[in-house]
């Protein structure tokens, strides 16, 4: 009550921000005539002038009004597009590192040119992040005309791009690319064996398009680079044959072997199911007779059993995946697109392959991973834009520290959003949808029907075909024609069925989009300029007639066939209609058999329908029902937020360790000579070995001198007469013995260095160190995965799983560093180098792996659960040696030796993980 009163008096926080930005808009508009009077050369010269002013100490905020006015004028001259006042406000919101919520069709792509140009002037690079390669390429070419006109270089990074081209793209002032490619390039840069192989610069400023999709939906799925692990695929085939013999329980108390929790997306074996599974495994020869499924030696069988159960009970063909060219291809849950080459982790993909009877490929081992949450938080400044962010504003603020600002529309929004209609059954719902589509088609109104899966998409298509209604289908299988289908979805009588969010980023123009046809005429060399102009004018007139016809019929009508878990995704579907003040309408059709209602709201809605005594085939349309559905969606949104927050809390532990490893790795690559580091490591390891045989503060009678002599000879190739030293020098005590052994080891190593020369030895030291660091880091990632999957069980022992995870992860990390030191020290002491070729051979074996895959692992896998996993895979192309030197720039702040160690131990960095340096 008090909040509402204060808002009325002072306005909301959003209103106050818009008011502040509007003052700057007035200043920009005042410069329009002056900037407009400049010649093209003078306008281009403004870029150099701004750069000089920055060099002299000017702040970007001081340049903002004039820089925005320059970009606006360039847009008018190059593209014939003038930035509206609301786009100027949006540009300022992005420049301030906030999220701009802007309705579909209001010109987000053009708006981004303002902050991108301003921030590119500083010379540190600006990254524009899109959801797919098509949009990255389109926007780089389209908006790149403005940047290039103003003397700003533009690059685009694509998934199959040559290494040298990618370096050049990152070196440009402004770079366009996908979220996946930026993340994978960061991981690849931290797997290189030479500083010149890196592609990225400092992570300065990122503008994320469709920020809700990338930072919320895809935040649940870590980016993973993996390589094939050794293993026999036969076990998947044999396990798959057993799964159909296990019986699914109808409910918790009914007989059966396993239950399926759709809400948590888990499969659980009952006690009877556990015994039945053991018998079947013994009969098949997978489980040795007389042993238990949960014996340590059989733990892998449990992994395979649950993977098989999930593959059969939770993952369905044409919904979660399709079969294409004899391979299981994942369908992206959020966009409906095919994710060619992506693979689910933890054996799930192999289990699905076994279920479908296609060739089973080997499991993967994680080489490097990061979540989008941790990747994008590394940018010095982060901003985003979308048509639907307000429902997730709290999460953006909590996780990323990003404020959401709702930008006013250029023209009032007049779309009519009708109330949901709820039916008892799917059949009744689809009959009502067909009737609505028929009505629109008869009136000449275009319709866009949104479905949640390929299965529903194709079901509706078959129903329309039966009714002899011509239509176009857009799902993952028609991915190549996506932009073309979406562009023409606004033509009169056009019926388009699309999976949710497919085609996002391409506007649906009422009357159809004439631009592709215009482009074809412009590029036709057989036509004269006058013929081109005449044909374009003729087409423009035809389009205007169609456009006016659609406006008269009520604009684009949106039909939702099911509510999504997130209100935001429903709003995105609705947002395809009513762009830039156009008319439009929308309605969702639901049934009690829909997944969301069945799992979260069926009892409440069913009881409402019974109270209202609804007859068969009759729809319910009531605020109570709408409220019940919204409450169900809020429940799911809150649950998903908790999962993402939990994932981040766990991943932060790995992220702190990743920062330490990557910083040390980068320092290794940059160092010409790491002798000081290897000498300190060797001394450390020798002290540990000596302490095992000569305990600290012990008397000489407790010393195991012969054991120490053997250990030094076996592990460090040091043959020392320790007993003779002690007999000849009675004053030789524990500390001086330590010192004598370390000096002897250093002398032996110095002899090796003199033998081959310091430069060759330094090169070898670095190669060995990198090899050991990378190998142990990969093994450590696997250990963290295993730890995380079982950590929730600590709750039964009244322990906090998160605290236990932090503690054990720290112990694993410390143990890994000790193993690296020991391995490097022993290798360097044992090696006999005779030529530079031997060193090069060692370095050659440690080149970046070539047969790797890039994928998203399911976010619940990271927490010991699984849901809607996605993965991406492409072979790394042969890396060419870069033509241009790329200076190393540290990612994030350097950790000082006396700073607290980022691993969370509470010790100083130099006394903890800084010891490796």
Swiss-Prot record:
**Region ranges (Disordered):** 866-917
Q: Does the keyword ATP-binding apply?
A: yes
Protein residues bound to Zn(2+): 901, 903, 912-913
Keywords of the record, alphabetical order, are: ATP-binding, Cell inner membrane, Cell membrane, Cytoplasm, Membrane, Metal-binding, Nucleotide-binding, Protein transport, Translocase, Translocation, Transport, Zinc
Q: Tell me, what is an example of a GO biological process annotation in this record?
A: protein targeting
Which PANTHER family is this protein grouped with? CHLOROPLAST PROTEIN-TRANSPORTING ATPASE (PTHR30612:SF0), SECA INNER MEMBRANE COMPONENT OF SEC PROTEIN SECRETION SYSTEM (PTHR30612)
Q: Which family does the record assign?
A: Belongs to the SecA family.
Q: What is this protein called?
A: Protein translocase subunit SecA 1
